């Protein structure tokens, strides 16, 4: 079955080659093409041929074309007749679409396409390799809602029903053959060279597989590309597979990741790379063009807390026509839902069943958890894959440029919801029609302007009608513009009553009727107690923190050893790396209404670093002004900030900052500044192997509420905030979330800067240099604690 539009993309041409068995005399074939409403739109009929191969042809005038945006399907009905009497019926659904590579660019229906894709293993934590249709549909709905348009069936043909559903939902499929021989070129076993290469004993098996794939899926409209396999390198056998596909199918291109094979142009129609850095992609676009389009068949390795810097790739796809997208590795964690000896359900991975050898939790690379809950990484991909960009022309006056990146869709099916809001809520909003053909336009919104406050212009492009994959009112694109940033977040602390200062018995205290602040003066020389209304707030001293629970990407860079000097550097005095504090001086100001305590610190790395914290205390609160002066002979710092512990009942959190999902300096495109209400329990992200999670950037202020007490923080101007029930080292040393220690505290990390999470790969790639905490600079963190 071949169904393609004409050169003007108006009429659809369908050709069907039918093979019959047995005697041909008296046999005839009728073909009907039905539209989605069941109307017959084309007919043809032929007598069967002596060679048992009968060609039927028809034209559908004004055909609706199939694409990921508009997956219009027609129904083909074939009737086999014997002397005019029907004896057999066959039907299938299909769409009209054209795939070609023209001038080094992949085009679908005459438009340059960007594959916004993911790799997907067929795996379910409850049923293993068997996937129900319900799960398939759930996957497709989540993919479409994430603005994805493509899937690579890594690394084998998927269930036929999946292919039918991709036709239905509109997903471009890179249909991958089951050939995987990763690593055989590096074998240390004598007599076990690379396979299949040019070895004749493998040729028949490989050819059989590629032929079976083609024959099974040749009529699937969603299949726009054949992939010959995964990481199997070159040789004569792959070349024969490539030539076979080119001979039998001129309607699709062929993909093969050849790993730099010198003859790769005889193996693949596209330049395919895995985990190339953004600069490598751009270098190809600028200097290494070999005439082929460039695809990232795997990129942004989504293992654990990852997917940082993905925006560096998507920006390039918009800039260079030959860079045509990529496929996230991968869609869902391949973990198994099981129970431990205590009957607790958990998602298990390699080694949990006593299996040896195993690959540990390296199966946890998904945008979804194994039980198909959405991870925070998903929302970053959703934002970066969206088809509409909003650019600020003059957001204060409500002038915004909208760029429509859909290929076949104007924006008449959507409406634009906009609102002006601040931390006090929405004060002006509206809905406007946006009827844009693919292109650009500037909108003028009727905005008001609040006085002397930071506010936000939030935009959402929403569907007007329910679709197969989303409800009416679903936001397919979002943007936020921050106006008058930081105008309302920091006021000087009120000092309405004098403090009594007591510097005796090994403690320095600042006290009022309701507040008692105590610094220990014997050994620790740290802030160790904040009592308000007789209630103790601190469960441990306020101290430097330079560590985060290692992420999977951190482990890949050997950060545990490479950056290990920072692991314990912020701890209170001990026998290993720690910080030694001293109270250098204190001053009583404003007639006793203010007490300023200057605390110095020597961080016992090798070589040492210096730090300082200035505490300005009043009866209504305390300002904390931290500076850290690292030694540039030391490696980068995972995190720079202060850590303290509150009682465990401090569970409810309200904050003004980036949200609603966890975010990091290199993974924050999907966030919006807003006032969010959450809990400390919900801030924890249950990655397959516990690791750094729950961070929030751009925090202006935050309030933690306990059973009887309130603890408020106000940043100057912003900080990062991480609140958890566990210390970083407790999280890092746990293999499953179910085994974390019982909750006995609430750990607050006020952070000047945490490093990016990275994501180029998980076996050695660092985060982008600009997201590292270098040691050739000074770090400062300033915030208030309000009583």
Residue ranges and their predicted role:
Residues 1-16, 20-27, 90-98, 369, ...:
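An acidic-aromatic loop/edge-strand motif
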Residues 17-101, 455-499:
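Extended acidic/polar, glycine-enriched regions
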Residues 11-47, 76, 399-431, 443-446, ...:
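Beta-strand-rich binding/interaction modules
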Residues 85-401, 406-412, 417-425:
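Extended substrate-binding grooves/exosites of carbohydrate-active enzymes
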Residues 67, 447-452, 463, 467, ...:
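Beta-strand/loop-rich accessory regions of lumenal/periplasmic or secreted enzymes
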Residues 52-58, 441-445, 779:
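Short strand-edge motifs at loop-to-beta-strand transitions and within beta-strands
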Residues 1-23, 375-413, 492-512, 626:
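Surface beta-strand/loop "capping" patches
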Residues 343-401, 405-423, 441, 448-491, ...:
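Catalytic cores of secreted or luminal carbohydrate-active enzymes
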